[in-house]
Amino acid sequence: MVFLSAPLWLRNRITDRYWRVQEVLKHARHFRGRKNRCYRLAVRAVTRAFVRCTRARSLKKRHLRTLWINRITAASQEHGLKYPAFILNLIKCQVELNRKVLADLAIYEPKTFKSLAALSKRRREEGFVAALGDGKEPEGIFSRVAQHH
């Protein structure tokens, strides 16, 4: 930027300050009280608002995730499943739906969610049967239980 004379340079500095002030006041227009008119108060309020806005972006993700989990928990309990068992068995069945989609299904597509709950419940029952086995101990293992014949 080239300034040909001192008056032009001074004039430019003044206009720069004016536009800088206007930029801050533009962000402060919706604030209450003197914070939307007085530059000194507006600078503090706008800075504080920007800091909170930055922090809130990460908090929003956390809040939405807890909301989705609460909705899925409530919907899965209607079908007789707890949330951890429901999610774990869906993962074992290779159903790759995230929590947002599951929460939306629970609200807007209850029949679809019911079928997912049935799938999860069936997988859980299969796991119990596999864990129990046939009820006999394998050969060559000493048990503390004394068998009397």
Swiss-Prot record:
CDD domains per the UniProt record, alphabetical: Ribosomal_L20
Superkingdom, taxonomy of origin: Eukaryota
Any one GO MF annotation of this record: structural constituent of ribosome
Keyword hit for Transit peptide: yes
Pfam families noted in UniProt: Ribosomal_L20 (PF00453)
Localization of this protein: Mitochondrion
Entry keyword Metal-binding: no
Transit peptide (first-last residue): 1-9
Primary location recorded for the protein, binned into one broad class: mitochondrion
Any Gene Ontology biological process: translation
GO cellular component, one term: mitochondrial ribosome
Keyword annotations: Mitochondrion, Ribonucleoprotein, Ribosomal protein, Transit peptide
InterPro entries (UniProt xref): Ribosomal_bL20, Ribosomal_protein_bL20_C
Family: Belongs to the bacterial ribosomal protein bL20 family.
Subunit organization: Component of the mitochondrial ribosome large subunit (39S) which comprises a 16S rRNA and about 50 distinct proteins. Interacts with OXA1L.
Official protein name in the record: Large ribosomal subunit protein bL20m
Species whose genome carries this gene: Bos taurus
Gene assigned in the entry: MRPL20
